[in-house]
């Protein structure tokens, strides 16, 4: 009796920088030696979209080339569509988001469309990882690290069903240190809004730059990246402040 051929690995890629962004294209190219790669990503830059879904208009999906789909929607829309419609009869083994054009450290994860795309994969039951390059130069380095993570997962599955957030320093591969497991750091409040006038004299506002690092000590993702190490942070979706439950219960019962 003949052995059944092993099912090839299948990976869904998404991002928040857009379907034609350098990061996702470099990652796809690196992973195609390992797996069938399907890209489902926004038609334009949707950075900062977080976990938003498009609810009041339809999603327009265009196949721009083989196994590459452009979606007029958010990163979360993209993964939701891919897993609940496009690939529902043959789900991917992994959902990877990125490579993001810039860091997703500390509080950034609450706003990040890159992390949100991976989180949607996690919600829908697929092991998911977000990758971000702390810069905009060495995408090949980040793609190589991502491939190594996938290869290690194939050899020995990731020992947690948590969503993983991985940041890679913007350095040549040979200058990178090892990978370290970290916790999220934190930033100060974002800087003030920037007010300007449009050509017609109307006031317009831009969001100010993100705040500087506040909690960036040893063990945080900020510190690890600063030291030239790759940072990997397991994230959980449960936002319950469990240590506060008893105190809140007592407060409510006090007369």
Curated annotation (Swiss-Prot):
A divalent metal cation binds at residues 16-17, 47, 100. Its cofactor is a divalent metal cation. This is 5'-nucleotidase SurE. It catalyses: a ribonucleoside 5'-phosphate + H2O = a ribonucleoside + phosphate. Its EC number is 3.1.3.5. It comes from Vibrio vulnificus (strain YJ016). Binds 1 divalent metal cation per subunit. GO terms for cellular component: cytoplasm.
């Amino acid at each position: 009796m003949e052995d059944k051929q092993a099912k090839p690995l299948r990976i869904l890629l998404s991002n928040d920088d857009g379907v034609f962004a350098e990061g996702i294209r470099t990652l796809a190219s690196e992973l195609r030696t390992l797996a069938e790669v399907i890209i489902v990503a926004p038609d334009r830059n949707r950075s900062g979209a977080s976990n938003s879904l498009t609810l009041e208009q339809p999603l327009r999906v265009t196949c721009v080339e083989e196994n590459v789909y452009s979606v007029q929607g958010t990163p979360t829309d993209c993964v939701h569509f891919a897993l609940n419609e496009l690939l529902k009869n043959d789900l991917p083994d992994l959902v990877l988001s990125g490579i993001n054009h810039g860091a997703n450290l500390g509080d950034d994860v609450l706003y990040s469309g890159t992390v949100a795309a991976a989180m949607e994969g996690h919600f829908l039951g697929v092991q998911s990882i977000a990758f971000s390059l702390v810069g905009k130069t060495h995408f090949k380095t980040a793609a190589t690290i991502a491939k190594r993570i996938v290869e290690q997962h194939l050899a020995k599955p990731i020992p947690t069903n948590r969503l993983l957030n991985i940041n890679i320093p913007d350095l040549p591969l040979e200058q990178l240190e090892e990978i370290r497991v970290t916790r999220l750091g934190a930033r100060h409040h974002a800087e003030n809004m920037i007010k300007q006038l449009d050509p017609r004299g109307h006031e317009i506002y831009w969001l100010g730059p993100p705040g500087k690092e506040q909690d960036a000590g040893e063990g945080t993702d900020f510190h690890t990246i600063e030291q030239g190490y790759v940072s990997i942070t397991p994230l959980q979706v449960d936002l319950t402040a469990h240590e506060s439950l008893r105190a809140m219960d007592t407060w409510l019962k006090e007369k």
